[in-house]
UniProtKB/Swiss-Prot annotation:
<dbReference type="GO" id="GO:0016655">
    <property type="term" value="F:oxidoreductase activity, acting on NAD(P)H, quinone or similar compound as acceptor"/>
</dbReference>
<feature type="binding site">
    <location>
        <begin position="17"/>
        <end position="19"/>
    </location>
    <ligand>
        <name>FMN</name>
    </ligand>
</feature>
<dbReference type="InterPro" id="IPR023048">
    <property type="entry name" value="NADH:quinone_OxRdtase_FMN_depd"/>
</dbReference>
<comment type="similarity">
    <text>Belongs to the azoreductase type 1 family.</text>
</comment>
<dbReference type="InterPro" id="IPR003680">
    <property type="entry name" value="Flavodoxin_fold"/>
</dbReference>
<comment type="function">
    <text>Quinone reductase that provides resistance to thiol-specific stress caused by electrophilic quinones.</text>
</comment>
<protein>
    <recommendedName>
        <fullName>FMN-dependent NADH:quinone oxidoreductase</fullName>
        <ecNumber>1.6.5.-</ecNumber>
        <ecNumber>1.7.1.17</ecNumber>
    </recommendedName>
</protein>
<dbReference type="GO" id="GO:0009055">
    <property type="term" value="F:electron transfer activity"/>
</dbReference>
<dbReference type="GO" id="GO:0016652">
    <property type="term" value="F:oxidoreductase activity, acting on NAD(P)H as acceptor"/>
</dbReference>
<dbReference type="InterPro" id="IPR050104">
    <property type="entry name" value="FMN-dep_NADH:Q_OxRdtase_AzoR1"/>
</dbReference>
<keyword id="KW-0520">NAD</keyword>
<comment type="function">
    <text>Also exhibits azoreductase activity. Catalyzes the reductive cleavage of the azo bond in aromatic azo compounds to the corresponding amines.</text>
</comment>
<dbReference type="Pfam" id="PF02525">
    <property type="entry name" value="Flavodoxin_2"/>
</dbReference>
<keyword id="KW-0288">FMN</keyword>
<dbReference type="GO" id="GO:0010181">
    <property type="term" value="F:FMN binding"/>
</dbReference>
<keyword id="KW-0560">Oxidoreductase</keyword>
<comment type="subunit">
    <text>Homodimer.</text>
</comment>
Length: 215
């Protein structure tokens, strides 16, 4: 079966998180429309993400060779194994759904830490000295969706200035070779439950068109 990797980046439980509420509605609808998929879930607030240390790398975005690995202590070796596991999990998927709130014009830090782990030479990208890096995830059909919640309602101009997260995620996906990308915004969650529910309902109405855009 094909695999949908559902990545959440919010410490709130699903019933309190607008992005995770819409994310759940999205993946459920996707699986209804595409029965040949199975889902794998990754909560970046519950999953350990290694901090990248220089000892783990032979060169930029390239993990150490076997000899250097054997010189690491047990904890360091476990961290390298975790990086490999996260990268392999990402590479094996066909569709990626990331649900996160907009924080500080971007997204919560665990998502950046995760991305730093999976952008790996020889697995998701090909990096050669003196040459432009090339994404390796164009080897089969793939698609990605970024679901983002934000308290404010943003017009086009404000979005260009304030919303860096969507643009970064789209850029990093395409950098790895994933060309099909869609955003699903949960804008205007505001400060009241009514505002939040309206924003969620509006986003859910767009789910089918977003699914059709990636698969």
């Amino acid at each position: 079966m094909k695999k949908l990797l559902y990545i959440t980046v919010n410490s709130k439980p699903e019933n309190l998180s607008a992005s995770k509420t819409v994310g759940r509605a999205f993946v459920n609808r996707f699986l209804e429309k595409h029965s040949d998929f199975e889902i794998e879930e990754l909560d970046l607030y519950k999953c350990h993400i290694p901090r990248l240390e220089y000892e783990y790398f032979e060169k930029r975005s390239c993990l150490v060779n076997e000899d250097a690995f054997n010189k690491l202590d047990k904890k360091q070796q476990e961290e390298v194994h975790k990086i490999v596991k996260l990268t392999d999990q990402f590479k094996e998927a066909d569709v990626y759904v990331i649900a996160a709130p907009m924080w500080s014009m971007s997204f919560p830090a665990p998502l950046k830490e995760y991305i730093d782990c999976i952008v790996m030479d020889g697995k998701t990208v090909d990096i050669k000295d003196g040459e432009k890096p090339e994404g390796l995830l164009n080897d089969k059909p793939r698609g990605a969706v970024y679901i983002q919640s934000s308290g404010a309602k943003m017009n086009v101009l404000l979005k260009m200035v304030m919303d860096k997260g969507v643009h970064y995620i789209e850029s990093i996906m395409k950098f790895m070779g994933i060309e099909k990308f869609e955003e699903l915004l949960v804008d205007g969650t505001g400060t009241t439950e009514e505002e939040k529910n309206k924003a969620i309902e509006k986003a859910i109405e767009n789910i089918d068109s977003v699914i059709d855009g990636i698969w």
